[in-house]
């Protein structure tokens, strides 16, 4: 996977905030958000139990509901 540390950090921050809002407000995203950012592609999936980001078919971040306040 060809992704620099700043890109990984931005995705981590985005997903952490998205998951915090999901836990606080109880919304769910039924369909994964698919994205293509040049050198990599993947999707974001949010459920009530966890949130994960998959880049180039590799799970790069997975957060369980209880790990975010």
State where each predicted segment sits.
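N-terminal acidic leader/helix
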Residues: 2-31, 62
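Detector for the mature cores of small, proteolytically processed
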Residues: 30-69
């Amino acid at each position: 996977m060809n992704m620099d540390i700043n890109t990984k950090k931005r995705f981590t921050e985005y997903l952490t905030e998205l998951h915090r809002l999901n836990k606080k407000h109880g919304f769910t995203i039924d369909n994964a958000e698919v994205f293509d950012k040049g050198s990599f592609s993947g999707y974001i999936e949010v459920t009530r139990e966890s949130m994960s980001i998959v880049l180039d078919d590799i799970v790069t971040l997975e957060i369980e509901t209880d790990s975010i306040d």
